[in-house]
């Protein structure tokens, strides 16, 4: 599966490393100093009580309108979403944008900009922090606390949701489908 991770913060870095380790074709979008740092050092994740992973990954600083991915996983803070929506909307080659952030406002703004058929909602089941050197210390949360979830707006099980939830498992990352997708964006 060809994926773009839109955002190179703690969660974007963590999911990029895990999905790359799981056999996916992953690119990360980072800007400015963070993009330069990734080009030099790669992505570095120290998973809690596990070994440190350092991976080389394709880095882009902008998403061209004709760049096609199976899915774009949008892992930015809620207060950054409005600023990234124009570049997501300009891209007509990607059929699916998975928004993974805490969003009390619900999905309507995303649907208004991108169209209902292009929006999936999710919630990350990981936590961590980024060190000054750019490395990330993170962990997958226990499923009892919070699974990584993804779902359609109407809760249906569709091929694109199943594709995200049944990918390679070598990364130790399990993504579950959710029939309550809009609720996942508020941490339910």
Q: PLM features: what roles do these ranges have?
A:
Residues 1, 24, 95-96, 117-118, ...:
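A structural micro-motif
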Residues 1-47, 164:
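NAD(P)+-binding Rossmann beta1-loop-alpha1 motif at the extreme N-terminus of oxidoreductases
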Residues 21, 28-30, 88, 160, ...:
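Flavin (primarily FAD) cofactor-binding/catalytic cores of flavoenzymes
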Residues 28, 59-60, 150:
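Generic preference for hydrophobic
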Residues 48-56, 151-153:
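Active-site-adjacent segment of FAD-dependent monooxygenases/related oxidoreductases
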Residues 52-138:
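Rossmann-like NAD(P)(H) cofactor-binding subdomain of soluble oxidoreductases
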Residues 105-187:
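Rossmann-fold dinucleotide-binding core
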